[in-house]
From Swiss-Prot:
Protein name (record): Transcriptional regulator MraZ
Gene3D superfamilies: Transcriptional regulator MraZ domain
A GO MF term: DNA-binding transcription factor activity
Known partners and oligomeric status: Forms oligomers.
CDD domains in the cross-refs: MraZ_C, MraZ_N
A Pfam entry, by short name: MraZ
High-level lineage: Bacteria, Pseudomonadati, Thermodesulfobacteriota, Desulfovibrionia, Desulfovibrionales
InterPro entries hit by this protein: MraZ, MraZ_C, MraZ_dom, MraZ_N, MraZ_sf, SpoVT-AbrB_dom, SpoVT-AbrB_sf
Superkingdom, natural source: Bacteria
GO biological process: negative regulation of DNA-templated transcription initiation
């Protein structure tokens, strides 16, 4: 599992140094260090170890491609995806089109979100946390109404 968050920066070539605990989790799941990066709906980048990404793709294969909305979402995630490999120094190269999509310049946040991790522009991440805190009760009520039960 990927947990926690840390401030990071890109090197001049667009590479991101992963923290040791993230590298360990990736290599535990994927000995060759392959990760799939894709855009997400929050204006950030999601990173999936290959077994997790394969589950995402399987869920799309099971979907109804006759629905235009389904095709749009599939296109957004699958066409936006690119495979990268963690190098010997523990870095991943973030392609220019994903850096542009996520507004990444230099300062960013790497956030562990369970079975995946997210790469955020630091300002966007901080704003999203403020919005979440301001709407926390409404979010919890909406999840409870839809049958989601969380333990804290």
């Amino acid at each position: 599992m990927f947990r926690g968050h840390s401030n990071r920066s890109l090197d001049p070539k667009g590479r991101l140094m992963l923290p040791p605990e993230f590298r360990e989790e990736i290599f535990r799941l994927v000995p060759d260090g392959r990760v799939m990066l894709t855009n997400n709906f929050d204006g950030a980048i999601s990173g999936y170890p290959m077994p997790e990404w394969e589950a995402v793709e399987a869920s799309f294969r099971a979907g109804n491609t006759l629905m235009p909305g389904f095709r749009d979402i599939e296109r957004f995630f699958i066409a936006g995806a690119t495979e990268v490999t963690v190098d010997k120094q523990g870095r991943i190269l973030i392609p220019p089109y994903l850096r542009t999509y996520a507004g990444l310049d230099k300062e960013m946040v790497l956030a562990g979100v369970g079975t995946k991790f997210e790469i955020w522009d630091q300002g966007r991440f901080e704003e999203r946390l403020r919005q979440t805190a301001a709407n926390f009760n409404a979010h919890m009520e909406a999840m409870a109404a839809s049958g989601v039960s969380l333990r804290f």
